[in-house]
Amino acid sequence: MYDIILFGDMPDRNTYSRASGSHRIGTELREHGYSVLVVDFSNYINIDKFSEIIDLAVGENTLGVGFSTTWFPFLLPDGSASNREPSKPAMRFNKAAENLSESLPVDFAGPHVEDYFDKVRSVNPKTKVILGGAKAFMYINLPGIDNVFIGHAETMVVEYFDSLSGKTSNRIWNKIIDHDKKAQRPSWDFRKSNISYEDESFILPSETLLLEVGRGCRFNCKFCSFPLIGQKNIGDYLKFEECLYNELMENWNRFGTWKYTIVDDTFNDSTEKLEMVKRVVDRLPFKPAFWCYLRLDIIVNNREHIQLAKDIGIREV
């Protein structure tokens, strides 16, 4: 049985792409000695399948079952929910998407959400039910939730489970945990971080995985609500070159992965970043393909970005 089980959704029912947040948190927790099962593709999990997984994975040692809300439906101010969002093409133009049933994400925005929490507690009443992800703030008031993590949670989840497991002194936790929502404690350094997938994730060579090169953006745009903007020193928010190389090589050697979506807020926010990624790509024994967010207006004033993007392997923006 696992210490912690994390459920992650997918951007779109037709893409079969995994969200990366649950795997980033899972990697961090494993590095601190916890056994973690990450379950992907929640769009294809209903309450019956969820119950099967819980029966197989939850035991007396299980500290928590968590859910990533990033690709869950939007909860609207009037209490209703919407699945029709631009990030989910299969649902964007499908009016029937509002009535999709029998899936974990849709049930989370409906009247049957407590069935999932009740199932967890029927196996182990002491197991905590937690939420994280980009839409966690929308789901704070769900009945049956023990704790909600807001923001980048690497440091907070480790402190939380260290307290629950007895590794550190017991703490009284607020329902909303956001004391280090930018993950900036001195004890942790994003630049050394990676995502390491387990064999039980069954990564296929044809998959497109998600990749962080940097966390944050050097610009401070008025319209942007992302938390880590306005960073002037690129050395503070870019992964170390060797760390990025090792992550790409691990996925290539273990799974044959060569396609990635780069999830940086603005991939071309500096020439230095592109040059660093090109150095990494030049060392690889394979030719990767990347998708990313680029600002075209920056390219106009930095024409060298065109050739750098081509050399790196940017296929689509």
Predicted regions span which residues?
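Structural motif
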Residues: 3, 63-66, 259-261, 316
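A general structural detector for well-ordered alpha-helical segments in enzyme core domains, enriched
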Residues: 25, 53, 112-120, 244-247, ...
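Radical SAM [4Fe-4S] cluster-binding motif and immediate context
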Residues: 186-317
